[in-house]
Amino acid sequence: MSQAQPPQSRSHRQANPNHASATSSALHTPTSPSLISQDDSLDIAPKRRFKSYRLRGDFEKPWLSDPAMKKTKWNNWIVRSFILLGFILAGVACFFMVWPYIEGSYCLIYEDHFTTLNKDIWTHEVQIDGFGTGSFDWTTTDPKNSYVDSQGLHIVPTLTNETTSITSHDLFANYTLDLTKDKSCTSKTNTSCIITSDPKKGTMIPPIRSARLSTKGKKSIRYGKVEVVAKLPKGDWIWPAIWMMPEDSVYGEWPRSGEIDIMESRGNSRGYPEGGRNFYYGTLHWGPTAEKDSYWRTTHAKQIRRGDYSKSYHTFGIQWTPNYIYFYIDSRIHQIMFIGFDKDRPLYDLGGFARMAENQTLLANPWAMSNSTTGNAPFDQKFYLILNVAVGSKNGWFLDHVGDKPWIDNAKNAQWTFWDAASKWLPTWGDGADRGMNVKSVKMWQAGQCGQSSEL
């Protein structure tokens, strides 16, 4: 391998005259700033000026005298006229479709931010029979189950054997719970106030205590709006609800006189097949008998995509008029369900009840004597507000054999098997107040101007 020669310096290269000439020629740059070689032999064409070929002056336009041209003009005007008419008719149609649902005047008749529990408005409903749903809770006035703090109203389920002197053995056998002794029971029916645990009959003292509060007899509306700001509970088989019932059941027993469920949910996790605490439902209950309740025609669920309803506060609301009931969340632009009423097809016809029978007897129309002119009966009466947290049920809210449900609704010992599985469901319940519903505020508006009669 030959040894590489060291590079020559600039001064050394310039010492060779032949080398310098070649280098100078190769690196020569023109003194002119133009990048185009100044060669006289190149012809550069001058810029051509734009020349218009537009005809000026008066010239004959024979196509304008063609009769077909006049027809084309008329056709264009006809098309334009129909387009304009279409816009006008669409605007008129939109106006008449929206006009019945334009928000009118409302009078705020009640607002509560729960700095304290206003006992002039809120009443505890105390019973042990599940209020017709077969839930496993005993509703109480105990401050462990309902209380107010800086976060608002809390409705929290607790275990009976941890918050009372009733033992685990008492829950199952030879113990009588009689709420008539201290006159705490708010029902007039003994079966709602007295129970004895008996293993032979399968009866059991409710293993859960919770609370249910209502504005019955204090605050109610017939048409208007309701908004409740709340955070929902966390835990398997917990059933929170914000709902309304009629002040006077003028059409008869449930569901003849109706029920408005503003919000119902389940405390189960997102993996629960029927929808856990990432879902909530709005529903109307109505029908001539309990077996013919047509709630399934007027129910809808809202799923939250991220998180669930136990992680933050949401506004659950309805707007109720003679023509419709509108369910929404957080604001009126977030519609959950719209149920319109039709005077030509009242709810009795919508349910198809005229074709149904029970005990070989056709079902009579329970709303035949209604004065409603919009076909909205039974939702033409005053309704009051209820806030509660139940646990379990035997009415199908938690479907049998779904999500490892530990009891069968129709079983005589449903509460027993539910309680036996406490080691599975209790760890899913939130800590402290998180296992309950936290209500930050309630607002109720009556339709119309303040001081105006609600008889719309």
Report the location of each language-model feature.
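GH16 jelly-roll
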Residues: 1-456
